[in-house]
UniProtKB/Swiss-Prot annotation:
Signal peptide: none annotated. Its main location: cytoplasm. GO terms for molecular function: metal ion binding. The keyword Phosphoprotein does not apply. Homodimer. One of its GO terms (biological process) is response to nitrosative stress. It comes from Staphylococcus haemolyticus (strain JCSC1435). Keywords: Cytoplasm, Iron, Metal-binding, Stress response. GO terms for cellular component: cytoplasm. It is found in: Cytoplasm. This is Iron-sulfur cluster repair protein ScdA. Di-iron-containing protein involved in the repair of iron-sulfur clusters damaged by oxidative and nitrosative stress conditions.
Length: 222
């Protein structure tokens, strides 16, 4: 049962579709998700009762019929890699030329698009480096740890990943603010609108990705 004291991150773990509701009201459920409903609604355009009612109307099942909470660490890592790492690498490759084109064509009259391109590149490059580090070093170390094997500096590994997630979250917030919540101006061309739409999708995917690691995977080692 969800109450005013229920923790946002735990709600999203149990009811993944609730992420859409938290996102709608600008409530962080990944890096800042370890807060209660009461804390989360402060300074937001929703009260706790309304938020709880909306969540309670959702079906209580995982998207894709995979209840990630009950996966062991190796299985969850494999899920994260196939569901997020592979798809995000592909999307970065496909989206980047459009971001460059919009900045080049419209940047002279809309300088914030050049700034958006810079933020996007920081976000993309940081995520690509982060995912490579996870795949090549950190995830294999966590799998060893889950099997009871000795891993040096295991707490440092997790803290470093959490710190990376926090930096990524700030870049996503900066891009959203710069683009007026991804609302294109009336004169925006189709490519401009496409970039905004796909950046919003990447933001959603990244939030879900980070939530799974911060609040499900890493909790298995606490």
């Amino acid at each position: 049962m969800i109450t005013n004291e229920s923790i946002v991150a735990e709600i999203v773990t149990d009811i993944p579709l609730s992420a859409d509701i938290f996102r709608k009201y600008g409530i962080d459920f990944c890096c800042g998700g370890n807060i209660s409903i009461n804390e989360a609604v402060k300074n937001k355009k929703v009260d706790a009762e309304t938020l709880i009612d909306e969540i309670n109307e959702l079906p209580n099942h995982d998207q894709g019929n995979i209840n990630v909470k009950y996966l062991d660490a190796p299985s969850l890592i494999q899920y994260i890699q196939s569901r997020y790492h592979e798809t995000m690498r592909e999307e970065f490759k496909n989206l980047s030329p459009y971001v460059t084109k919009v900045a080049k064509v419209h940047g002279p009259n809309h300088p914030f698009l050049i700034q958006l391109q810079d933020l996007y590149r920081q976000y993309r490059d940081g995520m690509l480096e982060h995912m490579a580090q996870e795949d090549e070093h950190d995830f294999p170390a966590l799998i060893k740890l889950s099997r009871g094997e000795q891993v040096d500096h295991s707490s440092d590994i997790i803290q470093s990943l959490v710190d990376d997630h926090t930096q990524t979250g700030q870049l996503l917030e900066d891009m959203r603010e710069l683009t007026s919540q991804y609302q294109p101006p009336s004169e925006a061309c189709q490519t401009w609108r496409l970039v905004y739409h796909r950046l919003m999708n990447l933001e959603r995917e990244t939030h879900e990705h980070v939530h799974l690691e911060n609040h499900v995977l890493f909790n298995k080692f606490s």
